Amino acid sequence: MDINVVITRCEDYTETLARNTRKVLPTIGRLLLISTFVEDGLRLLFNTHDHVNHFSYNWGLNYHFSLFLTIVMIINLLFGSLFVMMRYKVTESSAVLGFTIFAQVILYQLYTTYHLLTRNISIVAAIMLLVAENMLRKPKPANYTQLPRDEHEIEVTSVLLAACRVCLNLMLISMVHFDMSYTRILLCIISYGMMIFVWLGFKTRMMSFMLATWLFAYNIVLNDFWNKDAELHIIRYDFFQTLSAIGGLLLLIHTGPGEFSFDELKKKW
């Protein structure tokens, strides 16, 4: 079978899927996206003493201030996730979640490890997709077609979507390890090929769907924390962060690549 025919059929299938699931896909995407924040908030809640000691020992903070800092992060993570899921003050809630991620990168010194840093940048990109998706779904006034076109908002959402496409796929870069087998190296090369397509905004929905499917399978097979006792916390952390990246890809399928993409340029040509 001609490869162009296969690609066209895959594109048609993805476009049909995006249309048929336009009401439920954003909800699934948001649910997967906030999973890492819920898990993080619950982990802080049930291990408050350990985190308070971490801040006190590593940063020399007062015990009560360390406790206050931990409680604030718990509230931000859990209530921010709840508000996002309820579509209540999405932009503000996303900003709170993004600020909390930034604070954790500093407080836990995650910037010293590329594996953790790239994953957190990927999660921030997924949060930005929440903002872009919320802007795109804002109701338009009844006489919107008769009003002058607001170019500013379209430009903002397009910039957000372009930035999200680039940063979201950093999750894949974090999967590279020096002790990888040849099979995993081959899988990474294939996934990086799809990642470049998403970066460029070329056949974005199809490639985002393929990446989301691949990441889901990768996550279930290699981050099965329910079957492992050793390094449980690290594997569980990777599992939920990968889920959030998948949620971001599902939102990208729903929103589309935006104006700054090859897909949109092809339409203008």
From Swiss-Prot:
Signal sequence coordinates: none
Membrane-topology descriptor: Multi-pass membrane protein
Major subcellular location class: membrane
Alphabetic keyword roster: Membrane, Transmembrane, Transmembrane helix
Gene Ontology biological process terms in this record: Golgi organization
Pfam families assigned to the protein according to its UniProt record, in alphabetical order: SURF4
GO cellular component terms listed in the entry, alphabetical order: endoplasmic reticulum; endoplasmic reticulum-Golgi intermediate compartment; membrane
Keyword Ion transport found: no
Spans through the membrane: 65-85, 156-176, 182-202, 206-226, 242-262
Localization per record: Membrane
Motif (Di-lysine motif): 266-269
Disulfide bonds, paired cysteine numbers: none
Family assignment from sequence similarity: Belongs to the SURF4 family.
UniProt remark on domains: The di-lysine motif confers endoplasmic reticulum localization for type I membrane proteins.
Listed name of the protein: Uncharacterized protein T02E1.7
